[in-house]
């Protein structure tokens, strides 16, 4: 019987430059691809602010919709679940008889705590994380972590001097491993959240690639040091963190 793997999506809502998907595409397994929407994202926090406002929610839904369609083309299914992530994933692991869970490696305190709790609840499951949310992986750096510069400029100078080649993973032109469950849980539909007409910034891989091409095809990078601290102006920031 083939291994049953759950891929927990977080900030990696793309099929290109996704080492996890590229590796899964070459293996033999049954695959469950899951994204969990946390209701706390849309609630006021201690400062009466919501982590996700209307525009960020629209950006997220656009990204999920585009990924959903891309996965369908590769023979897979995106399952969008809702609830507290650890509880939702613990239940999903039990229901789908998951042997292994894969996800991006995060440096955030809350994300690391969630993963630690999930490991404690599911000791029989193998957990694997991959660095794919950063420009460089730890193995690329020309120094050990205990020698990591304390500020950006010394870091940049060391990295520039090392001339580290950047390679992107490419999803093979084949179907992904078969889905554990074919019918999507809560499929993303075309609605006001996925409508592109009124959005200043659009979510999804295609929009990101278009933005990168537009940004680097002109003179904007050459003026970045001048404009990076501006509080207004669409072209004054890279928007690479979006």
Predicted ranges, named:
Residues 164-242:
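Catalytic cores of enzymes that engage adenine nucleotides and/or redox cofactors via long glycine-rich
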Residues 1-167:
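Trp/Phe/Arg-rich N-terminal binding region typifying the photolyase-homology
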